[in-house]
Structures are given as structure tokens and as C-alpha cells.
Swiss-Prot record:
It is found in: Cell inner membrane. It holds the Pfam family LrgA. This is UPF0299 membrane protein MS1271. NCBIfam families: PRK01821.1 (NF002494). It comes from the Bacteria. Disulfide bonds: none annotated. Its main location: membrane. PANTHER family: HOLIN-LIKE PROTEIN CIDA-RELATED, UPF0299 MEMBRANE PROTEIN YOHJ. GO terms for cellular component: plasma membrane. Belongs to the UPF0299 family. Keywords: Cell inner membrane, Cell membrane, Membrane, Transmembrane, Transmembrane helix. InterPro entries: LrgA/CidA, Uncharacterised_UPF0299.
Amino acid sequence: MRQKIFLFVRSLIILYLILFIGEGIAKLIPIGIPGSIFGLLILFIGLTTQIIKVDWVFFGASLLIRYMAVLFVPVSVGVMKYSDLLVSHASSLLIPNIVSTCVTLLVIGFLGDYLFSLNSFTRLRKKAIKKRDINNVNNKGEAS
């Protein structure tokens, strides 16, 4: 029991420390990117370079992910509270969201097409096509 408490406290301290460092960077560099995003980038870089061990943050992160839906309840209540404001500004909210979604889909589509056209991705492309063909055969067999 003490071991689990230690793991939980250690992982939360590390996660919050990274969050506060990200908030500090966001205050030092006022470019409109939230501190939590800087914190996520620091965490990502730390995990990929293995400066931060996965075991150090796994217990707290998995607990937070498990209860993520509960953590979004206040946000949902806030959206419902200001629904009249959202409806009155619907066009100024929806148009940028739709445009940015379409641009993102196009960029990802072209990037994927480019990456799959490279010679180094030939093996990956063959593997993906083989998996797709197997899924198509299985789906046709289930439909009959």
C-alpha cells in the first residue's frame, strides 16, 4: 500500500512540476500557446530521451486517464451555462473550426501520400495493403 502511495505521489509531483515549468515558459514567451502544451512537449521530450522514465509517471498518468471523463464535467457544465452565447456567435466559431479541420485533413492526407510514396516506406506500404486485403476478405466472409 505504501509503495502504491509513493508511486502515485511521485508521478503526480513529476507531472505537476512539468506543468508548472510549461506555465513558466508560457509566461516568459507570450506567443499564445498555453502552458499545458509546453508542459506536454517537455514531458514528450523527456520521455523520448528517457530523461524521465515511464515508470516514474505511469501510475499517476494512468489514474488521470482513467478518470478523464469526470475531469471534463466542469467544462461541459460551462458550455451548457453559456449556450446562448455560443449560439449567438455560432458562425464565428464554426467557420474557423470547419476550415481548420479541412486544412488539417488535407495536410495529413498529402503528407501520408508523400510518405507512402518514398522508397523507405515500401515495406510499410506492402504491410498496410496486405492487412487491408485480409480485413476486406474477412469482412466479405462475415457479410455472406
